[in-house]
Amino acid sequence: MTSTCTNSTRESNSSHTCMPLSKMPISLAHGIIRSTVLVIFLAASFVGNIVLALVLQRKPQLLQVTNRFIFNLLVTDLLQISLVAPWVVATSVPLFWPLNSHFCTALVSLTHLFAFASVNTIVVVSVDRYLSIIHPLSYPSKMTQRRGYLLLYGTWIVAILQSTPPLYGWGQAAFDERNALCSMIWGASPSYTILSVVSFIVIPLIVMIACYSVVFCAARRQHALLYNVKRHSLEVRVKDCVENEDEEGAEKKEEFQDESEFRRQHEGEVKAKEGRMEAKDGSLKAKEGSTGTSESSVEARGSEEVRESSTVASDGSMEGKEGSTKVEENSMKADKGRTEVNQCSIDLGEDDMEFGEDDINFSEDDVEAVNIPESLPPSRRNSNSNPPLPRCYQCKAAKVIFIIIFSYVLSLGPYCFLAVLAVWVDVETQVPQWVITIIIWLFFLQCCIHPYVYGYMHKTIKKEIQDMLKKFFCKEKPPKEDSHPDLPGTEGGTEGKIVPSYDSATFP
C-alpha cells in the first residue's frame, strides 16, 4: 500500500509518522452510523429485558427453576448493555480513546465475562428443557431449587475462568485505531483463541443441537399421538351422529305407519255406518213404495251413485295419503343427504379444538380424512393406515428450535469466525471496516433477541406482559359523581335537601 505522506510532508512534519491507507481510521460518518445503530439496539434491549424482568418479579409463581435461568440471562444482558456497550459507543468516534491500554484489557475481559455467562446460561436452559420434556416424572427430583442455584453460580464461576486470562497475560487486548474498537489481538495467543472459540460456539452448539433434537422428536411423537386420539374421537362422533339420525328416521316412519293404519280403520268404520244408514233408508223406502216401483228404482240408482261417489272420494283420500307419504319419504331422504354432507363439515368447537395442548387444530382436510371414501376399494377402506400427520404439528416445534439455534449462531458466529481468521490474517488491515461494524452489531443484537426467544415466546409470560401493559397504558377511569343519581350522597340524591358540609361542621 502507498503511504499518505509525501517527501515535502516528511521534511516539514518530521515529528508526525506516516499512516498507510490500510490503517486509516474510520470516517466520522461511519462512526455516527455505528453509534446510532448501537444506541437503537441498546434501547430495545433495555426495554425488553426490563419489562420481562418486571413480569417475572411481579409473579412469584413464574420464578420456577427454568425461569430463574431466564432471569439470569436477562441480568447478563442488562449488565452487558449498561457497563460495556456505552464504551463501545464512545470509542466509535474516530481517534477517540480516553483511557490507557490496561483499561482496554479490563473492558475486553468484562465483555467476555458477560458473554460467557450468557452462553453458559443458554446451555443450562437447553439441558433443563431436555430434562423437563424427556423425563417429566423424575424432573422435580433432579432439578431442585438447590441444584438450580448451584447451576446459576456455576455459570458465573465458569465465565470468570473463561474471561480473565487476558488479565494475567494469557491473551492480549489493545485498542484498534483503524476500526475504533477495543478488542482482542487473537493472533498473539492462538491457544486462548481456540479456548474462546470452543467455549463460545463449539460446545454450546453441540449441546443445544443434541438436546433440542431429542426434544423435537419427542414433540413430534406427542403430537402424532394426540392427532390419532383426536382422529378417533372424530370418528366416534361421526358414527354417533349417523346412528342418531337413523334412529330418528326409523321413529318417524313408525309414527307415520301407525297414523295411516288408524286413519284407514276410522274411514272403514265411517263407510260401514254410511252403508247401514243407506240400507235402512232403502228398506223404508221399499216398504213405503207400494204406490210405484219406478220411484224405488230411481232411489236405488241414486244410492248406487252415492256409493260410487263415496268410493271415488275414498280413492282420492288414498291418493292424497300416498302423496303425503311420498313427500315425507322425500323429506327423509333430504335429511339423510344433509347428514351425509354434515359428515364432511363438522363444526368443531373450542373444546374439540383443544386436547391437552393449545396448538392442536384440525382443518377441513383432517376432518375429511376421518370419513373413508366409498369410491376406494375395500382393501384400502379396511386398512388400518392412518392419514399423514399435518404439517402444523411439526412446524411449531421446528420453528422454535430453529429460532433459538439460528439467533445464537447469528450473534456469536461471526465474532468467532473473525477470531479464527485473525490467527492467519491481519484483521486490522485486511478485513473491511464495515464488516467489523456489522460483527459488532450482531454481537450486541443477542441482547435484543434473548427476551423474545426465551420470554415472549412463552404463552404464560406473554399473557402476563399483555396484562401489565394494558394496566399501564389503559388505566380505568374512576366513576363520575353523577353516575348514580338515585344514591344518597350524590348530586341527584341530595337535590332539594340540605346536607351539612365539612366546613360548616368545623367552622361557625
From Swiss-Prot:
The keyword Nucleotide-binding does not apply. Glycans are attached at residues 7, 13. Keywords: Cell membrane, Disease variant, Disulfide bond, G-protein coupled receptor, Glycoprotein, Membrane, Receptor, Transducer, Transmembrane, Transmembrane helix. Its main location: membrane. Residues 250-288, 318-338, 476-485 have a biased composition (Basic and acidic residues). GO terms for biological process: adenylate cyclase-activating adrenergic receptor signaling pathway; positive regulation of MAPK cascade. Residues 244-338, 476-508 are annotated as: Disordered. It comes from the Eukaryota. The chain crosses the membrane at residues 36-56, 69-89, 107-127, 150-170, 197-217, 400-420, 434-454. It is a multi-pass membrane protein. This is Probable G-protein coupled receptor 101. The gene is GPR101.
